[in-house]
């Protein structure tokens, strides 16, 4: 398995690919009045490269109008940082052709940065005694201040509950931290007062975690422990950021006031959609008094003053300013972007709308506020061999195709290294979003984020040969791959992926493949799961195939539930018709759906809430817990086909205790009184439940999964199962 992506080998592979047609050059020492045909200014400085991207684009347009560039063109961008005042946009008139693409690339091995930022300079010591008194004594000698307006920066953006980031500060190539308390980790909501003038959220009646209060119920106030806020000056623009009720949903909330005597915070509407719940995590931010560590900064938006404690040895700073994509391809086709770094913007690095056969390859996306690349519409657009990290939102959006006709969009993300993303919004952001029909994500390395890896929203997607690890590090009830709540999202294949070291602090744990809320018609095959939490979760859906996977030290390897018969029965009793409406929206009873997915014709039978026709065959599992079955008392597990698996886990089955009444609570580890039992390997009931499978103790023959070796030992029980070997050496990015 390839564990590391050596970016520069990929850059040289992609950016060094041959490009035909006329060659042009852009340089920081160029001039848009020149021909752009020289790589450097001529001796007499009468000709040379262009100076700007826009200048080169406009010159190419003129050449095409004259009938030139029929073989395409290559625009070589010389090294340096190019600050963009506005989005660099290419439209249909800038397109290449199949035989003559237009390539915009970094010249040879030179490093090219397209930046949406501005330098922040003119820092001085804090001399205002009123400000100095608010700083901690240890910070006063280190904190500097500058007026952003003479720096040419007047738009600071706004902090909104679920929007992208406003102005951010970078120094030494790293994102700096808005002054916060606590500096690391989280505070906890001490309580949520249950009285007031306005009840903003009635809460979730079925989930009462503490003191009999429905989760999320609030009157716009929370309380805190400790005395720290008593030091802070009221009236400054203070915020809190937290996971307010669920560990899969965060938001920023502005503080209206703090009653330090009662240790009570009144929050300014709009409030978090799921309310506020006792003991949930949060921290305070944008508080001058908490600017107390190197790398922290505070912005007084009213005065335009930025306060900063620079890290040792750092003398430069840059603020993100451009609140638009750095580069946009609008209806453009046969265009390639290669070997370029996109940095310091508040939104996407590259946005592609419509058009076809565009590629972004061997590029670096970092220190951005939005997604790295957003592809919306068009056909056959892709992102290849790019390094995406330290972006405020997600990595790559693949959106396209026509769902009603099942026409594929054919977008792809291949051979990318995507990590340390979702730095601003901590949930709802992904390494890759697949939306529409017929996209593929393959040979990527995805790791280290607070939330999930890939979201699937559509049909006929393929996710293969990817490695996922250390995801969901701050969250819970989340999966490395996540989908759900639409019966028509079918035909998706998840195969030959490696999931390992998945663990999060949040409620409900984390999953490898999360087929949430009745996701149906998925194939999960040939995957490797090592310490991957609840490795494969079937959340009430049907027609899913979980075949020929290896599970090691997972808890559990496979989860099956019938939530539609329990806590989520309101999806089937007429309270909401969401699932059925989505089927009608796709005209499921007529072609192409009736032919491609004939199982949909049976979804409205007499028992649509029962997880029928799931198939779990030929898997190997050991060292953890084989299966959790929730709502166990509500349905007959025999509707799920479970056979020919090698099961060697210490615990075979986790289910609700006999005699327990009511819905399965699904709470997991709140008060340890949930009424679940674990049936060990050797238990007679568990043996009966899983008859038709080979139940063993100890390693059944997987060679050395702790070292990433999942090959099967010859003549072992696992090998004799007839297991089809997983092509493990092909997993992850190609090239080292």
Model regions: which residues?
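Glycine- and acidic/polar-rich repeat regions and solenoidal domains
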Residues: 97, 347-351, 369-376, 389-708
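Core nucleic-acid recognition elements
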Residues: 382
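Bacterial N-terminal signal peptides
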Residues: 5-13
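Boundary at the C-terminal end of the N-terminal hydrophobic targeting segment
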Residues: 16-21
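Extracellular polysaccharide-degrading/modifying enzymes targeting complex plant/algal/animal polysaccharides
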Residues: 25-354, 359, 366, 582, ...
């Amino acid at each position: 398995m390839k564990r590391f992506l050596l970016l520069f080998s990929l850059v040289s592979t992609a950016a060094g690919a041959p490009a035909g047609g006329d060659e042009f050059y852009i340089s920081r020492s160029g001039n848009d009045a020149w021909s752009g045909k020289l790589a450097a200014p001529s001796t007499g400085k009468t000709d040379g490269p262009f100076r700007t991207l826009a200048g080169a684009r406009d010159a190419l347009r003129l050449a095409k109008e004259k009938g030139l560039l029929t073989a395409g063109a290559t625009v070589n961008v010389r090294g340096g940082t190019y600050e963009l005042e506005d989005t660099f946009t290419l439209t249909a008139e800038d397109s290449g052709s199949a035989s003559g693409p237009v390539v915009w690339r970094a010249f040879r091995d030179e490093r090219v940065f397209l930046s949406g930022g501005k330098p922040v300079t003119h820092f001085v010591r804090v001399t205002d005694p009123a400000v100095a008194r608010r700083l901690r004594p240890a910070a006063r000698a280190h904190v500097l201040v500058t007026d952003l307006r003479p720096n040419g920066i007047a738009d600071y953006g706004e902090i909104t509950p679920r929007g992208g980031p406003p102005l951010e500060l970078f120094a030494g190539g790293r994102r700096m931290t808005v002054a916060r308390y606590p500096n690391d980790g989280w505070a906890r909501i001490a309580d949520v007062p249950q009285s007031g003038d306005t009840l903003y959220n009635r809460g979730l009646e079925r989930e009462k975690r503490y003191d009999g209060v429905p989760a999320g119920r609030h009157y716009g106030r929370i309380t805190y422990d400790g005395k720290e806020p008593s030091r802070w000056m009221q009236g400054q623009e203070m915020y809190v950021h937290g996971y307010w009720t669920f560990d899969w949903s965060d938001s920023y909330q502005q503080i209206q006031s703090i009653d330090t005597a009662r240790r009570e915070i009144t929050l300014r509407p709009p409030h978090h959609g799921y309310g506020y719940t006792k003991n949930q995590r949060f921290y305070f931010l944008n508080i001058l008094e908490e600017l107390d560590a190197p790398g922290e900064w505070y912005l007084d938006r009213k005065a335009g003053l930025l306060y900063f404690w620079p890290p040792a040895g750092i003398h430069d700073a840059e603020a993100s300013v451009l609140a638009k994509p750095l580069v946009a391809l609008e209806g453009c086709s046969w265009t390639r972007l290669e070997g370029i770094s996109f940095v310091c913007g508040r939104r996407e690095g590259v946005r592609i709308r419509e058009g076809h056969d565009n590629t972004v390859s061997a590029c670096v996306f970092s220190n951005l506020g939005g997604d790295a690349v957003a592809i919306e519409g068009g056909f056959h657009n892709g992102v290849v061999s790019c390094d995406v990290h330290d972006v405020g939102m997600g990595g790559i959006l693949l959106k396209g195709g026509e769902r009603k006709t099942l026409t594929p969009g054919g977008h792809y993300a291949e051979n990318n290294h995507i990590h340390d993303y979702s730095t601003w919004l901590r949930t709802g952001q992904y390494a890759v979003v697949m939306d529409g029909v017929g996209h593929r994500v393959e040979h990527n390395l995805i790791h280290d984020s607070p939330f999930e890896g890939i979201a699937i929203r559509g049909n006929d997607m393929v996710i293969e040969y990817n490695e996922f690890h250390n995801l969901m590090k701050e969250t819970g009830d989340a999966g490395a791959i996540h989908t759900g709540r639409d019966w028509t999202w079918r035909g998706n294949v998840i195969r030959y992926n490696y999931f390992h070291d998945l663990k999060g602090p949040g409620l409900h744990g984390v999953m490898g493949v999360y087929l949430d809320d009745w996701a149906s018609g998925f194939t999960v095959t040939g995957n490797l799961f090592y310490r991957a939490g609840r490795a494969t979760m079937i959340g009430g859906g049907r027609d899913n195939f979980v075949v020929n996977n290896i599970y090691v030290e997972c808890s559990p390897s496979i989860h099956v539930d019938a939530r539609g018969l329990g806590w989520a029965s309101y999806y089937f009793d007429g309270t909401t018709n969401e699932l059925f409406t989505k089927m009608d929206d796709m005209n499921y009873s007529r072609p192409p759906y009736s032919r491609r997915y004939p199982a949909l014709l049976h979804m409205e039978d007499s028992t649509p809430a029962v997880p029928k026709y799931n198939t779990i065959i030929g898997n190997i599992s050991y060292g953890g817990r084989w299966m959790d079955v929730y709502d166990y008392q509500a349905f007959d597990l025999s509707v799920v086909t479970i056979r020919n698996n090698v099961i060697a886990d210490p615990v075979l089955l986790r289910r609700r205790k006999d005699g327990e009444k009511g819905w399965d609570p699904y709470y997991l580890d709140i008060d340890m009184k949930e009424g679940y039992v674990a049936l060990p390997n050797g238990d007679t009931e568990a043996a009966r439940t899983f008859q038709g499978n080979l139940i063993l103790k100890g390693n059944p023959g997987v060679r050395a999964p702790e070292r990433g070796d999942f090959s099967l030992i010859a003549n072992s029980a696992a090998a004799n199962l007839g297991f089809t070997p997983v092509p493990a050496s092909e997993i992850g990015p190609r090239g080292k």
